[in-house]
């Protein structure tokens, strides 16, 4: 027997994400208090694995939104190319990530399954930026680029 993917498109997950943040306007630090992720992965072959895959995608998205950035000097050399200088989210910084599911089986995959987890890498940064800007709206400011570092928040507030 043989199998070919020709004519069978990739089937991606759909999701909705949101979070509650606390922005310290004195330090610029953002703490994610709670995060919600609802994904439609179609048929879940291993539901526990899917839950943790979604959480992993959200954590990766948190890293992109708040921490991860390649910094180069004027000669083009990477200046933060080690784990001491390249920031990633740590376990103690992780919020409670609440995962839920909407299930619509895909008619384009044999088992009705779709992707699982990748939505967090794209959805989480948007949800985080929206939550931070919502927290700052009464101060008539916003941040417009990621990662959303304390320095960027303080600059948006006119404090540095």
Where does each model-flagged region fall?
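Cofactor-binding beta-sheet edge motifs in enzyme active sites
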Residues: 1-160
